[in-house]
Amino acid sequence: YSLLIKRRELNMERVIKVGHLGLILTRPLLNLVTDSAASATAMSTGKRTVINRIAKSKQGKDQETILEIAKGMGKSTGLVTTTRISDATPAAFGSHSLSRENRFEILDQFLEKGIDVLMGGGIQDWMPKKTRVGDFSKISLKAGAEKFSKRKDKKNLIKEAEKRGYQFISQEDELIKAPDDIKLLGLFSSSHFLMALDRKKSDHTGIPNLALMTEKALKVLDRNEGGFFLMIEGGRIDHAGHNNDAASVVAEILDFDEAVGAAFQFCKEKKDTLLLITSDHTTGGTGLSYIVRNKWGSDFGSLENLKAISRQGASFEKIWEEFGQKPTTDDIKRVIYKHTKIKISKSEAEFIKNPILLSPFHVTAYKNKKKVYTAHAIGRILAKRYQVSWSTGGHTNIPVMLIGYGINSRKVAGLNENRYIFDVMKEAFGLSVIHP
C-alpha cells in the first residue's frame, strides 16, 4: 500500500535493510493466544505470564521491568501511546497489577515511579469524579471535552503530577511549545485517541500524531547523559483490527511508521542506542486474498483494490456514530457512500442494520456488542471491494516480526519467544542476562 499508493518505502523497511530481522512467538502461559497484558509483560520482564496480568507472575509476584531497571541505573524513562496511557502495553512496562483493568492503580504507580515522559489518552482517569474533561484541559470537543471523569473518588491525579514536577499539556500546539528540560505529562483525549482516519490535520482535533510525540519524548529523555528507555506504541492498530476495519489498520500502521522514521533518524545519529520494532500480537487474522469469481477464473486483486481502501475517509467508529440510534437502510447506504465512495445494496445495508455474530471467532465478550457486530458487518461488506479477508475479530497466535537497529541489534535475528526481547534490551544496557 505504501509503495503503490503513497509512493514511498516504509520506514520499517528502511530499518530492516540496514538492521536485523527476526520472528517472535507470542504464546502466554496456559493459553494458545495472548492478550496485550501477557505479551507486554513477557517483553518488559523476560517472564511469561497469564492473560490480563500486568508485570506479575501467575502467582501474583511482581516481576522487575526493563523500565524499572533503567530507572535504577539513573536513566530517564518514557511511555508514549495512542491509547489510554493506562492501557495494557504501557502498563506492563511501568506498573504491576493483577489485572489490566486496574487503571487507577496503574496510574498511581506511574507517578510514584517518576516516569519522565507520559503521553497518550485517557484524561478521564486522572480527574476527580463527576468533573468534565473540558474543565481540566484544552482538549477539543472532537477529542472528548464534554466527557466526564471515570473515577469514583475525588482524587486529582493531574494536580498530583504537577506537584511532582510534571508539566501538563493537552493540545498539539502545547506539545510543540513545551520545553525539553521538564518531566512531561501529555493527555490529549478523553479516552483512546481518535482513529488516525478521524484525526487528520483537517479534522482539527488537537491530537498530535505519534511521530510528533516520539520526537518530543526523545528530546526530553536524551538530555540525560546516562541514557534512557522509551516505549512507543501505536495502540490503535489493534483496535482497528478488532473492528475488521482495513482502511483504519492501514492508516494506523502508517502513523506508527512515521514514528519509526523519527526514532530511526535519532538512532542513526546516536551510535549507542538500540531501536527495536515489534508487535505484542496480531489481530483479525487478516490479509489480501483472491476471489473465485466463476468457474473460468479467479480475481487475484489489483491496484484498484488498494485505491478503494485509500478512498475510505473515516473509521468504522465514526461511521457507526453517524448511523445514529435507529438508522434506516437508506441512512446506512448514504453514510457508507459518504465515507468510502462505495455504493452498497439494500440487502447489504440490511446486513449492517441487523448484524449477527459472523463466526465463533468474531468474539462476543465486548461491553458494547452491538457496535462490534456492526463494525464486523461493515468490514465483511467492504472486504469484497478491498479483497481483504478477516478470520476473526480477536487476536491470533501468528508470529510477529522483530526488527532491530543499533547496539546489540544483531541479537534479534532468528526465531525467539517474546520474553527474549527483554534480554536484548538488558544486554544493550551493558547488563548480563542469567537464566535459572
Regions picked out by a protein language model, each given a short descriptive name:
Residues 1-41, 90-436:
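A post-motif C-terminal structural segment
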Residues 52:
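Glycine-rich oxoanion-binding loops at beta->alpha junctions
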